[in-house]
Amino acid sequence: GYFYLRAVLTQKKIIKLRMPVMSIKTILLVLGLILSNTVCAFAKDGTIDTGDTAWVTMSTALVMMMTPAGLALFYGGMSRYKNLLNTIAMTLVAYCLASIVWVGWGYSLAFGESSSLFVGNLNHLFLNGIDVDSITGTIPTIIFVLFQMTFACISVAIILGSVVDRMKFSSWIIFTILWITFAYAPVCNWAWGGGWMHKIGALDFAGGNVVHINAGVSGLVLALFLGKRKGYGKEAMIPSSVTFTALGAGFLWFGWFGFNAGSALAADGIAASAFLVTNTAAAMGGLAWLFVEWKHSKKPTLLGLASGAIAGL
């Protein structure tokens, strides 16, 4: 609407005020345009859902915390004191390297469209073709890239537990780059990028195959290849800080809500169900380990409780 004020001063006369009234047709036309634009903003297919975007963004931050905070403290606390700082440093450098590799070529190999059923292409090298307007599902593609990046980071960091005290820092750097490129990205493509596992209907909701089996098998192979730690079976392998391990388990437990519930890529009932199951599994795992250890050794330990919770997750 609008109005204007016209004042006319005449000889000893009052100010006259005139206010034109908009026609009914004009008012209806303006309201119609406003309502139609409002409806279109919510009805278009392929548009960004702010609720889903906010949830996946928060989940990305939660999963990110699992590596430089959760695993760093969890593994660092269980390692011998002389390896504490080195273990934490290896966790942090794994996160940094995996982040760069993922943005550079890892994402493209994992999610790039390709006729091959085993690996993607390099069309999205250094995120080529992805901008602020790109959408995956109901969230910005950039957020999807970051969420998947945190999965790649924690996957390679999980392997670190198999090589603590047995692998040089420089060798770990090389391994991280090669593993993300030739192990993680292809397996990710198989399950989530339209590869052969996806084609046969395999369901990997939150990384059971891509993350845990992949990292677990790789860690086993590395442990067998490197052999036992020096002094194993002869010297006491005393954890440097059980407190660190317990704190790390807490960070991992907290971050795992984003890991599992965030994998729904939406703020919906599936995410809520995953959230509930995640917490229940961790709690049950911790209690089961605690009571079994209590019965077996007549004494429960904080290390056992923390280990059980992570095993449940």
Regions found by a protein language model. Give the residues of each.
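N-terminal leader/targeting segments
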Residues: G1-Y2, S263
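Intrinsically disordered, low-complexity peptide-like regions
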Residues: Y2, K12-K13, L35
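A generic signature of intrinsically disordered, low-complexity regions enriched in glycine/proline
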Residues: R6-V8, V56
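Hydrophobic alpha-helical transmembrane bundles of multi-pass membrane proteins
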Residues: S23-L313
